[in-house]
């Protein structure tokens, strides 16, 4: 018989740097999950992606055990890294924060493909380009 899922917790944590301090501790502690076990597992699985923010979906079961699924980094983080900017523009229509090439856009779309609701790479590129546009980052050919 399968274990019954009590709750699903979604967090976005820096890769390899999860610790029991907030937001991890309170989110997991209220469901009785072993916080240190999660932190060690998460850090081990994400240590190769240092510097990125990795979203994680934690399923907590009745017996207080857990499993988690790592997602791809948010498109905005990948776009900022590719453009080499600290943050997007506060007024994307008036001020541009930077630019990325079509090749960089395709690379980001390829990375995000498993988590995007797109059937092909072109659709994924359009989704990522929309995110870039909203951040004030232009896509050049």
UniProtKB/Swiss-Prot annotation:
SMART domains: RL11. The lineage of its organism: Bacteria, Bacillati, Cyanobacteriota, Cyanophyceae, Oscillatoriophycideae. It comes from the Bacteria. GO terms for cellular component: cytosolic large ribosomal subunit. Belongs to the universal ribosomal protein uL11 family. It holds the Pfam family Ribosomal_L11_N. GO terms for molecular function: large ribosomal subunit rRNA binding; structural constituent of ribosome. Coiled coil: none annotated. InterPro entries: Ribosomal_uL11 (IPR000911), Ribosomal_uL11_bac-typ (IPR006519), Ribosomal_uL11_C (IPR020783), Ribosomal_uL11_C_sf (IPR036769), Ribosomal_uL11_CS (IPR020785), Ribosomal_uL11_N (IPR020784), Ribosomal_uL11_N_sf (IPR036796). One of its GO terms (biological process) is translation. One or more lysine residues are methylated. This is Large ribosomal subunit protein uL11. Keywords: Methylation, Ribonucleoprotein, Ribosomal protein, RNA-binding, rRNA-binding. Forms part of the ribosomal stalk which helps the ribosome interact with GTP-bound translation factors. Part of the ribosomal stalk of the 50S ribosomal subunit. Interacts with L10 and the large rRNA to form the base of the stalk. L10 forms an elongated spine to which L12 dimers bind in a sequential fashion forming a multimeric L10(L12)X complex. SUPFAM superfamilies: Ribosomal L11/L12e N-terminal domain (SSF54747), Ribosomal protein L11, C-terminal domain (SSF46906).
């Amino acid at each position: 018989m399968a274990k019954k899922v009590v709750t699903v917790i979604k967090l976005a944590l820096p890769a390899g740097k999860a610790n029991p301090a907030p937001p991890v501790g309170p989110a997991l502690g209220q469901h009785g999950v072993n916080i240190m076990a999660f932190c060690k597992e998460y850090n081990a699985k994400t240590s190769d992606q240092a510097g990125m923010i990795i979203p994680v979906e934690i399923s907590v079961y009745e017996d207080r055990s857990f499993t988690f699924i790592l997602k791809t980094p948010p498109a905005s983080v990948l776009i900022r890294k590719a453009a080499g900017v600290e943050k997007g523009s506060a007024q994307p229509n008036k001020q541009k924060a930077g630019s990325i090439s079509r090749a960089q856009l395709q690379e980001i779309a390829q990375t995000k493909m498993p988590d995007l609701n797109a059937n092909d790479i072109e659709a994924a590129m359009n989704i990522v380009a929309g995110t870039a546009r909203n951040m004030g980052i232009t896509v050049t050919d």
